[in-house]
């Protein structure tokens, strides 16, 4: 059984491997460059230490696959829709997004919209001019996936102390402390760089990042019960565990710069973009997670 978030958080996982029938947990662990050493103090007391000189992320299910949970932060994702169903998607193939959409203020008539794999379909239904206008509006209501914010390779290390208590039913206790960078992706954003009150001007973007320097302290035990039953368990504590904020709140926060133009134009407050994260200046970084115990 694979339980996420335990003491084994130092190991990146290939999630797709766990979907295979008959797969063992060890098959999902990804190799990472590291140094490891151990020392035996007595027959009952030992210590282990490691230092990783390489960081790798957990490989989540790719965009469009059966078990994928989203199509923008997973491998293959290139954009996120900000229109919440009010406009059509600019492309079917996410690899064509950059060639189709100009991040800024795309307008009907720009030749790049013809790069969309949806252009021929929409042009046959509505005509070339309307198809270009629809795709330009779609591009304006989409936020590009910006460069991922990967952590540094250094700064990951840990220590484990193991005690074998023969008098306590031959139980092995483990005590752990380590510092590592997140293997799981978290979502943040960049606020729109323009304040024009039109979906054609949305320049908000999505950032996939991996917070650094997460501290973990853990305890484990391993023993046997009557009847040959193995019993084991663990506890872990993180004083600064990163917790994801709802992605919709991040998107609304990234669109709050447009409120300046909406207010100046006399638009009713009901049309403003409101987020629990507050308001942001154009182009500001919107952190999409909090650190909690």
Briefly describe each language-model feature range.
Residues 1, 51-57, 165, 177-183, ...:
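Transmembrane beta-strands of outer-membrane beta-barrel pores
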Residues 1-76, 80:
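Outer membrane beta-barrel
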Residues 2-5, 60-66, 186-192, 244-250:
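Outer-membrane beta-barrel translocator domains and adjoining extracellular loop/strand segments
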Residues 30, 42-44, 166-168, 180, ...:
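Outer-membrane beta-barrel channels and translocator barrels
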Residues 34-39, 159-163, 175, 219-223, ...:
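Residues on the lipid-exposed face of transmembrane beta-strands in outer-membrane beta-barrel proteins
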Residues 47-49, 171-173, 231-233:
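Transmembrane beta-strands of outer-membrane beta-barrel proteins
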Residues 66, 74-151, 200-204, 258-290:
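Flexible glycine-rich, low-complexity coil/linker segments exposed to the extracellular/periplasmic environment
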């Amino acid at each position: 059984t694979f339980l996420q978030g335990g003491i084994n958080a130092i190991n990146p996982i290939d999630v797709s491997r766990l979907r295979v029938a008959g797969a063992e947990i060890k098959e999902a662990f990804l190799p990472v460059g590291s140094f490891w050493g151990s020392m035996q103090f007595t027959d009952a007391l030992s210590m282990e230490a490691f230092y990783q000189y390489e960081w790798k992320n957990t490989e989540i299910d790719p965009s469009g696959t059966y078990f994928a949970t989203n199509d923008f932060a997973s491998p293959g994702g290139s954009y996120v829709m900000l229109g919440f169903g009010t406009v059509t998607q600019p492309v079917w193939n996410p690899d064509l997004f950059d060639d189709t959409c100009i991040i800024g203020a795309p307008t009907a008539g720009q030749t790049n919209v013809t790069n969309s794999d949806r252009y021929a379909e929409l042009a046959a239904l509505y005509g070339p001019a309307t198809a270009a206008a629809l795709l330009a509006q779609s591009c304006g209501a989409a936020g590009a996936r910006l460069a991922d914010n990967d952590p540094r390779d250094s700064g990951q290390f840990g220590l484990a102390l193991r005690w074998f208590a023969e008098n306590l039913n031959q139980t092995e206790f483990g005590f752990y402390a380590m510092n590592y960078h997140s293997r799981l992706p978290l979502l943040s954003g960049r606020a729109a760089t323009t304040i024009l009150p039109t979906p054609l001007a949305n320049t908000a973007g999505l950032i996939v990042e991996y917070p650094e320097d997460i501290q973990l302290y853990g305890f484990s035990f391993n023993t046997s019960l009557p009847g040959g039953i193995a019993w084991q368990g663990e506890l872990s504590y993180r004083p600064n565990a990163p917790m994801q904020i709802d992605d919709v709140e991040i998107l609304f926060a990234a669109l709050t710069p447009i409120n300046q133009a909406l207010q100046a134009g006399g638009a009713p407050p009901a049309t403003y973009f409101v987020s629990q994260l507050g308001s942001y200046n154009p182009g500001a970084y919107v952190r999409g997670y909090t650190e909690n115990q």
